[in-house]
């Protein structure tokens, strides 16, 4: 499902991690005076034996991990802690609503691929424009793309307007929503009010926060 890992990278792309490097080591070695490591949560798109796929969103003014992803080469090392998950639908769930920006779409897709054949879903995927969406074999044809166009990530209103106009039966519905923290908070309040959802029918996670 939406398994996510905490990835830790070193300022030196050629850095080799010691055996049994842990989250404790990360916290101990990073001080106010010296912080050679950076870390952030990323969701796992897919898992194979001895391999995992993680999607990075490359953008202007990237953070340390996005910079690392652009420069990484074969055998570049990264430390990982986890996985964890926030996708926990209650028993009896029959339909799903996935709402995600670029950072959360891998988690949504991984969750969709684990649904049973008789379970229905709707996806609202936000991205910049037609050129930044990806192709996906969607047997139910239930992925709806919402484009920000010239609006910066974390500032668009089209996704919220689409959510406000949703008409869904809340019975046996589970909502997974993740993306920019402030937008997710607004969407959560909107859905809770409009659909009268119980707490166990919702998973809302801020994957990142817009600053400035």
Cite the ranges covered by each PLM segment.
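Extended, composition-driven regions rather than compact fold-specific motifs
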Residues: 2-212
């Amino acid at each position: 499902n939406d398994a996510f890992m905490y990835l830790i990278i070193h300022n030196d792309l050629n850095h080799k991690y010691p055996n049994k490097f842990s989250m404790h080591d990360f916290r101990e070695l990073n001080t106010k005076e010296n912080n050679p490591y950076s870390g952030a949560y990323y969701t796992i798109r897919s898992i194979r034996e001895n391999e995992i796929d993680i999607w990075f969103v490359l953008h202007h003014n990237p953070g340390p991990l996005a910079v690392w992803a652009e420069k990484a080469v074969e055998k570049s090392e990264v430390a990982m802690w986890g996985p964890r998950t926030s996708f926990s639908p209650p028993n009896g769930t029959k339909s799903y609503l996935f709402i995600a920006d670029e950072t959360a779409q891998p988690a949504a897709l991984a969750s969709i691929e684990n649904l049973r054949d008789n379970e229905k879903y709707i996806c609202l995927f936000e991205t910049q424009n037609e050129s930044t969406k990806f192709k996906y074999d969607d047997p139910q044809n239930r992925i709806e793309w919402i484009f920000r166009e010239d609006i910066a990530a974390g500032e668009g209103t089209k996704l919220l307007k689409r959510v406000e106009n949703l008409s869904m039966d809340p019975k046996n519905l589970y909502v997974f929503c993740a993306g920019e923290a402030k937008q997710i908070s607004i969407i959560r309040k909107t859905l809770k009010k409009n659909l009268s959802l119980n707490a166990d029918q919702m998973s809302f996670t801020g994957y990142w926060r817009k600053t400035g």
